[in-house]
C-alpha cells in the first residue's frame, strides 16, 4: 500500500473485538475480528474473562498493523459500556472475571437503595439499576475477593484496554464511559464523592477522566504493536455510534441494533432535567470546555438472544440458522 495516514479503531463489543484500519486516501479498510467467551455462572449472571478480552484486542490489532505499511496516526477505542472489572496496578492481573452490563446480580441491592434514587437521578441522569457499574463495583469489593489496597484499579473495558496498551502508563476513561457508572456527576463532570461513598467505592481506585477526543496515552511496544502510537479517542459504543452517524445537531438521533438496541438523541450542551422512562447521559466531551449530552432509551437483549440460543441452549449451530427457524412456525404461540 502507498504511504498514507492511517487511523485504527478498536471496537470492543460484548461478544467480540474488531480492529479496523481506515486510510486517509480512501483505500479499502483492513480489519480483524475475534469472539470471546460468555460466562453464565448463575441465572442472571454474565461474566467475561478480562485476559481473554485483552488477548483478542492484541491479536486483532497486531493482525491489522501487520497489513498496514503506512504511518499510524492514532488509535481510537469504543467499547461495551458499564461492564466493570478490578485489577492490580502492580501486577496487571485481574481480580476474577469482569461483570458484564447485562448482569443482574445486584438487583436486590439496588432495591435496598431505592430511597437514594433522587440523588442518583440528579447527579448521574441514570436510574438505580444493576445495569450500571456502581453496584457491580460494590459487589466486587464485598464478594469478589478484591483487596482494597493502594494498587486496586476499578474500571470499565476502555480503561482495561488502555492500561494494557500502555503497559500501565495510563489509567484513564472518558466522560461518556464514566457517565455510565452511577458514580459520575454529569453536571460537575467529575467523580461524585457522595455516590462513591454510597457504593463504598474508593475514589483512588477509579481512573482519571479525560476528554473523548485527545491524547490519552501512547502504546508501549509488544509483539506486533509498535511503541508510540497515540491513543486519541475513547467513547462508549452507543455514544460513538451517535457521533459516527453525524448526529451533531440538537435533536438528531440514531438507533443501533446489536447485542441490545439503543436509541440516543443529541440534546445539546445543557444537561436536561431527568425525563421519565429515559436516561440522561454524556454523549461526548471533545475537550473544548463544553459537554454534549444525550437522552437514551435502551432494550438490553436483542442480538445477544441469538448467541444465547447458540451457546446457552444449543438449539442452533450458527447465527444464520435463526431466520429459517423463526420462519418455520406461524407465530410465537403467545410468548
Positions of predicted regions on the chain:
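Short beta-strand-loop/turn "lid" adjacent to the catalytic site in phosphate-handling enzymes
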Residues: 62-101, 127-131, 138, 162-185, ...
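A generic structural motif
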Residues: 35-37, 101, 285
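Short linear loop/turn motifs
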Residues: 206-215, 321-328
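Active-site core segments that coordinate phosphate-bearing ligands/cofactors
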Residues: 2, 8-10, 107, 114-171, ...
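Residue-level signal for inorganic ion chemistry
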Residues: 26, 49, 75, 103, ...
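N-terminal glycine/serine-rich phosphate-binding loop of ATP-dependent small-molecule kinases
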Residues: 1-96, 122, 148, 225-233, ...
Amino acid at each position: 500500500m502507498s504511504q498514507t495516514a492511517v487511523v485504527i479503531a478498536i471496537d470492543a463489543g460484548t461478544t467480540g473485538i474488531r480492529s479496523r484500519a481506515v486510510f486517509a486516501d480512501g483505500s479499502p479498510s483492513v480489519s480483524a475480528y475475534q469472539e470471546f467467551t460468555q460466562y453464565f455462572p448463575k441465572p442472571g449472571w454474565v461474566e467475561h474473562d478480562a485476559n481473554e478480552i485483552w488477548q483478542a484486542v492484541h491479536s486483532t490489532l497486531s493482525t491489522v498493523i501487520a497489513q498496514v505499511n503506512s504511518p499510524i496516526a492514532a488509535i481510537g477505542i469504543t467499547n461495551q459500556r458499564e461492564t466493570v472489572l478490578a485489577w492490580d496496578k502492580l501486577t496487571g492481573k485481574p481480580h476474577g472475571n469482569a461483570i458484564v452490563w447485562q448482569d443482574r446480580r445486584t438487583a436486590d441491592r439496588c432495591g435496598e437503595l431505592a430511597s437514594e434514587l433522587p440523588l442518583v437521578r440528579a447527579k448521574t441522569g441514570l436510574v438505580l439499576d444493576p445495569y450500571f457499574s456502581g453496584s457491580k463495583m460494590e459487589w466486587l469489593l464485598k464478594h469478589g475477593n478484591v483487596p482494597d489496597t493502594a494498587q486496586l484499579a476499578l474500571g470499565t473495558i476502555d480503561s482495561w484496554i488502555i492500561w494494557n496498551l500502555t503497559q500501565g502508563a495510563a489509567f484513564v476513561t472518558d466522560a461518556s464511559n464514566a457517565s455510565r457508572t452511577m458514580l459520575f456527576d454529569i453536571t460537575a463532570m467529575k467523580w461524585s464523592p457522595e455516590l462513591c461513598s454510597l457504593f463504598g467505592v474508593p475514589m483512588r481506585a477509579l481512573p482519571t477522566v479525560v476528554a473523548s477526543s485527545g491524547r490519552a496515552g501512547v502504546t508501549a511496544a509488544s509483539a506486533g504493536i509498535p511503541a508510540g502510537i497515540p491513543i486519541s479517542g475513547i467513547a462508549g459504543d452507543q455514544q460513538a455510534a451517535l457521533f459516527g452517524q453525524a448526529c451533531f445537531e440538537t435533536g438528531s438521533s440514531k438507533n443501533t441494533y446489536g447485542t441490545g438496541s439503543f436509541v440516543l438523541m443529541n440534546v445539546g450542551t445543557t444537561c436536561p432535567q431527568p425525563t421519565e422512562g429515559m436516561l440522561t447521559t454524556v454523549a461526548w466531551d471533545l475537550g473544548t470546555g463544553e459537554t454534549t449530552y444525550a437522552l437514551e432509551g435502551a432494550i438490553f437483549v436483542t442480538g445477544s438472544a441469538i448467541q444465547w440460543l447458540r451457546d446457552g441452549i444449543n438449539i442452533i449451530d450458527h447465527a444464520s440458522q435463526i431466520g429459517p427457524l423463526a420462519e418455520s412456525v406461524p407465530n410465537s404461540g403467545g410468548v
